[in-house]
Amino acid sequence: MIQQESRLKVADNTGAKEILCIRVLGGSGRRYAGIGDVIVATVKDAIPGGNVKKGDVVKAVIVRTKKERRRADGSYIRFDENAAVILRADGDPRGTRIFGPVGRELREKKFMRIISLAPEVL
């Protein structure tokens, strides 16, 4: 469950290490975002020579959350950290690699490029 001012780890190789959520997209009063939701964020920490730099405003999709999420079959999924993947304007990931597992909810939200790059889909 991600809201404004939440900090997330970046799970790709764009050069950003940490981002801060500044808006949850999808409705005027939307407060929380979960796995598969798109947010607007700013880069808070980045490595030198990366594709993005500190202060850049980016769109990102959430791939892991600490807050458990109930699935249709009654099971729950949760991760050890909050993480996101930075997106281009067309919705594809900006990086070429994804680190760590991602939630199956991304498949239902049509983020197939992220699913194919991820080492594990839970």
Curated annotation (Swiss-Prot):
GO annotation, biological process: translation
Annotated InterPro entries: Ribosomal_uL14, Ribosomal_uL14_bac-type, Ribosomal_uL14_CS, Ribosomal_uL14_sf
Keywords: Ribonucleoprotein, Ribosomal protein, RNA-binding, rRNA-binding
Function statement: Binds to 23S rRNA. Forms part of two intersubunit bridges in the 70S ribosome.
Record-level Gene Ontology MF annotations: large ribosomal subunit rRNA binding; structural constituent of ribosome
GO CC term, one of those recorded: cytosolic large ribosomal subunit
Encoding gene per record: rplN
Protein family: Belongs to the universal ribosomal protein uL14 family.
Assembly and interaction partners: Part of the 50S ribosomal subunit. Forms a cluster with proteins L3 and L19. In the 70S ribosome, L14 and L19 interact and together make contacts with the 16S rRNA in bridges B5 and B8.
Protein's name according to its UniProt entry: Large ribosomal subunit protein uL14
